[in-house]
A protein has these predicted regions:
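Short Gly/Thr/Asp-enriched flexible loops that form oxyanion-binding sites at enzyme active sites
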Residues: 100-111
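General beta-strand structural signal in soluble alpha/beta enzymes
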Residues: 6, 26-29, 47, 64, ...
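Short, acidic/small-residue loops that bind anionic groups at enzyme active sites
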Residues: 112-128
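N-terminal beta-strand-loop-alpha-helix module at the start
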Residues: 1-55
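A glycine-rich helix N-cap at a beta->alpha junction
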Residues: 60-67, 117-121, 146-151, 156-157
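Short phosphate-binding loop-to-helix
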Residues: 62-84
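Long, charged alpha-helical interface segments
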Residues: 127, 132-219
Length: 219
């Protein structure tokens, strides 16, 4: 089974398509409000409930966390999912909103899951975020996404190779101070992009297009 973590950023019913009947759902704090648009029921609700009152619902497992703690509610949920033996976690409601620091924090949570052997995905209505660990090659078949961006998650990534994209990389270095990997696209005739890194983890962002654009242009 897969674990789905619902964080507090509001989501649209459009994301209901991502859920599976056997998903184990953990709602974090105000993230339980996302259950209604997604048409799902949480298995666990947890948080310090500083952004929403603690719900009173029958048959729900509710974990009340202290306000003073090292882990965010989403990080606590991620560790709980790992402890329960899930090998795949989808985070919804973890991107955007009025607290950009939580988006950055949730990226760190995603990488932490990967480091514990759990495949992590963060997704919203327009973008999907995944990770590539050192020594790993991941394939990204062409789906509804258009833009393909890769950034060094640990400040520097060496030996980065990317194939099937408009701007290919061969044993390249990506650094935090220069966004070389932003806004790539699938090469003409390509139905899959593969990317690998020898040293340093990557965060990969796939994004849908806004309007028809000219291939080969970077903003």
């Amino acid at each position: 089974m897969r674990c789905v973590i619902l964080s507090a950023c509001p989501v649209s019913p459009e994301l209901k398509r991502l859920l599976r009947p056997d998903d184990f759902i953990i709602a974090c704090d105000a993230g339980y409000r996302n259950c209604a648009p997604l048409g799902c029921k949480p298995n666990i609700i947890l948080g310090d409930f500083d952004t929403a009152p603690c719900p009173v619902q029958q048959n729900d497992d509710i974990i009340v966390l202290p306000h003073v703690k090292d882990d965010t509610d989403t990080e606590y949920a991620a560790k709980l999912a790992s402890e329960k033996g899930f090998t795949e976690v989808l985070l919804l409601g973890a991107l955007g909103g009025r607290r950009i620091e939580h988006t950055l924090s949730n990226l760190a949570t995603g990488l932490g899951l990967e480091e514990r052997g759990v495949r992590a995905t963060l997704q919203d209505e327009r973008s999907r975020i995944t990770f590539v660990r050192p020594g790993e090659t991941r394939a990204y078949p062409k789906e509804e996404f258009f833009y393909f961006s890769a950034f060094p998650m640990e400040g520097r990534a060496e030996g980065v190779c990317e194939r099937g994209s408009y701007y290919e990389l061969t044993d390249d270095v990506l650094v935090a101070g220069y966004p070389l990997g932003v806004s790539n696209e699938y090469a003409e005739g390509s139905d899959c992009i593969t990317i690998s890194t020898r040293k340093g983890a990557l965060v990969v962002v796939e994004t849908m297009p806004d309007t028809p654009i000219l291939t080969g242009n970077k903003a």
